[in-house]
Curated annotation (Swiss-Prot):
Protein family membership: Belongs to the adenylosuccinate synthetase family.
Top-level taxon of origin: Bacteria
GO molecular function terms listed in the Swiss-Prot or TrEMBL record: adenylosuccinate synthase activity; GTP binding; magnesium ion binding
Active site feature: 13 (proton acceptor), 41 (proton donor)
Free-text remark on how the cofactor is bound: Binds 1 Mg(2+) ion per subunit.
Name of the protein in question: Adenylosuccinate synthetase
Cofactor field: Mg(2+)
UniProt-annotated binding residues for Mg(2+): 13, 40
Transmembrane segments: none
Residues that, per the record, bind GTP: 12-18, 40-42, 304, 330-332, 412-414
Record gene name: purA
Subcellular location(s) per record: Cytoplasm
Main location: cytoplasm
Length: 427
């Protein structure tokens, strides 16, 4: 069986956890392929809500194997805390597999992330301060420490000593911060190694074998398309590639194994942190969207910026990711509006464009061009068939589909597992 990819089609927080959980019942493996604990998924099952940061949402399905791929950067302390929290709630985490090739977030990564962000002042990007960027930086610089190094204490110490020789110079002499002691880190990470060793595996080989045997593999991205380090609103982006092109690399499988790419997209738009946001609503309407939609970060708790649906970035996401399907979430949040504006293009320096601007300078100056669509006032959270939605809601979905250029195959009308209207089967 081929693999399928699930990605965020906006600035993250689109509802990927809900989508992954829904599809999890039909897949054998769910693989996280990039990012770190700087993002979060929320999955609601009945009266229970689960916030996941590193562990793939598939862990909540007993017949599904959750995998953390080689493209992820892992803070082992955070991972173990998340595992313990799930275990305490009766969730079996023994099936979790971790790629030996994934990189570790170290104490010096967190320290440098926090102090650098403070040093930048008003020019700061708005990172979570969890060390993700510095960890990816060391990976590219070939000075990183990987999960497999936990299996060899001698190699781990050798790599750590080499890393801290430089990092401590920066921390103490540039930022006037305390040096990080090798022995303390070795002791801390040895305890992590003891607990994580049973979960470490050659996950790329395992997944390729599973695909050859006809198993279904779901590749789950974190964050969103507009936060991609190459294709996002740089420099206000994450340090990895959430887009579909990285899914195979970050999971350790060949790209020809993938035949479907599903983009998760909200019925409106949100963003966390700094950076351009053409449709942002800095008014009472924006506050209302935030309140009704519960728009606060799973990882940071920060209030999300809110705005109307942006068809320009939707088209961009379809193009950059090669999306075959859209999964529209939070349609229920828009109930109660007389009309719902949708951004169909931008005005930049007096000129109209319907496509993503080539430069970030242009994007910063983009003014949204709206069309007003009829709204609806009915509560749609209990609707179980797309055909039973109010006509205006159906028309809204159809319009977004046409503007984005990809079929809407599922619609979320609430946070629960059962609150999803499937239009086209995704698996």
């Amino acid at each position: 069986m081929p693999a399928l990819v699930l990605i965020g089609a906006q600035w993250g927080d689109e509802g990927k956890g809900k989508a992954t959980d829904l599809l999890g019942g039909a897949v054998d493996y769910v693989v996280r392929y990039q990012g770190g604990n700087n993002a979060g998924h929320t999955v609601v099952i009945g009266a229970e809500s689960y916030a996941l940061h590193l562990i793939p949402s598939g862990v909540l399905r007993t017949d599904c194997v959750p995998v953390i791929g080689n493209g992820v950067v892992i803070d082992p302390g955070v991972l173990l805390s998340e595992m313990d929290g799930l275990q305490a709630r009766g969730v079996d985490v023994s099936r979790l597999l971790i790629s030996a090739d994934a990189h570790l977030i170290m104490p010096h990564h967190r320290a440098l992330d926090r102090v650098t962000e403070r040093y930048l002042g008003k020019a700061r990007i708005g990172t979570t301060g969890r060390g993700i960027g510095p960890a990816y930086g060391d990976k590219v610089a070939r000075t990183g420490i990987r999960v497999q190094d936990l299996l060899d204490p001698g190699i781990f110490r050798q790599k750590l000593e080499l890393a801290l020789r430089e990092k401590n110079q920066v921390l103490t002499k540039v930022y006037n911060r305390r040096r990080i002691e090798v022995d303390e880190v070795v002791e801390e990470y040895a305890a992590y190694a003891e607990r994580l060793t049973p979960h470490i595996a050659d996950t790329g080989l395992l997944l390729d074998t599973a695909l050859r045997e006809g198993k279904v593999v779901l590749l789950e991205g974190s964050q969103g398309t507009l936060l991609d380090v190459d294709h996002g609103t740089y420099p206000f982006v994450t340090s990895s590639n959430p887009t579909a092109g990285y899914a195979a690399t970050g999971a350790g499988i060949g790209p020809t194994r993938i035949n479907r790419v599903i983009g998760i997209i909200k019925a409106y738009t949100t963003r966390v942190g700094a950076g351009p946001f053409p449709t942002e609503l800095d008014d009472k309407v924006g506050e209302e969207l935030r309140r009704i939609g519960g728009e606060f970060g799973v990882t940071t708790g920060r209030a999300r910026r809110t705005g109307w649906f942006d068809a320009v970035i939707a088209r961009y996401a379809v193009r950059v990711n090669g999306l075959t399907d859209l999964f529209l979430t939070k349609l229920d949040v828009l109930s109660g509006f007389d009309t719902v504006p949708v951004c169909v293009g931008y005005e930049i320096n007096g000129q109209r464009t319907d496509e993503m601007p080539m430069t970030q300078t242009e994007f910063h100056h983009a003014k949204p061009i709206y069309v007003e669509l009829p709204g609806w006032h009915e509560d749609i959270s209990g609707v179980t068939r797309f055909a039973d939605l109010p006509e205006a809601a159906q028309a809204y979905v159809a319009t977004l589909e046409e503007m984005a250029g990809a079929p809407v195959s599922a619609v979320g009308v609430g946070p629960g597992r059962a609150q999803t209207l499937v239009i086209n089967e995704l698996i």
